[in-house]
Amino acid sequence: LYPSTAGNPDLGWEKTAMLNLGLEFGLFNMFTFELDWYTSTTSDMLLDVPVAEFSGFSTIPMNIGKVSNKGIEFSLATTNKWGDFTWNNRFNISANRNEVVDLGGAEEMLTTTESVTFITKVGEPIGNYYTLVTDGVFANQAEIDNSKDPDKTKRKYAYVEGAKPGDFRYKDIDGNGEINENDRTITGNYMPKFTYGFSTEMKYKNLDLAVSLQGVQGNKIANIFRRYIDNMEGGNNCQIDALDRWVSEDDPGSGLVVRANRSATGMNGTTSTCLLYTSP
């Protein structure tokens, strides 16, 4: 047995200051409206801080963060009654904006979970995805040869070590003509911009029927499983996207799906935007 997380005897409680303003009113015994606005600031927030690997741990929990949340919530409910029949409906929508205010003097922190790197940065939401950005696939050997041109100003695409035709290209974020970890950038967040829901309930005497729907919009989901099933490796199953894979220069597919292969080459197995799903 061994501890999975480093202990910290100096940990304390998080502190939150919050202001909430609300408005609620009804009309004709049929309609009910609710509107809430809130702002909160959490200090001494518990965050996992990277530590030297010789400690035996990658991170240690510390009270160093300050984060603000601001948002609005709205709901509308209706009640209709005709004799023994009652029909109730409710719709709600909310939006929250999260921002890191302070990290104990640091500007940013990186943490990695299940091969996905997250960046927590002052002025940004907590836990943005921090990945490479795919830029289609190399259509032919000529594009790869061009990416190796000694005159980097002539390169159409950045150099990817070990890449073959049909392998992923990536955007050269730092502009040095080569793809490496310095080309990672913020590529989205798991927190939705909007959360909404709708429910309806119908009652007649002792019978009732209820339906409830919920959804989110504007967030991204990292699907690590795609790293294997969308990598077109021979030892794994594939999704229907495989039909759009690169086959040859004359049959490039959609230009977004890598070639079929026995073992990934280039940086096809690297965590990138190809693993991120965007909600509608």
Task: Describe the predicted segments one by one.
Residues L1-T32, T59-W82, P125-N128, N189-F194:
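Outer-membrane beta-barrel signature, preferentially recognizing the C-terminal barrel domain
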Residues S40-T42, V51-M62, N182-R184, G188-F194, ...:
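Active-site beta-strand/loop architecture of penicillin-binding DD-peptidases
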Residues L21, F33, W87-N89, F198, ...:
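Transmembrane beta-strands of outer-membrane beta-barrel proteins
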Residues Y277-P280:
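Conserved small/polar residues in nucleotide/adenosyl-binding loops
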Residues M62, K81-G188, D230, Q239-M267:
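Conserved small-residue
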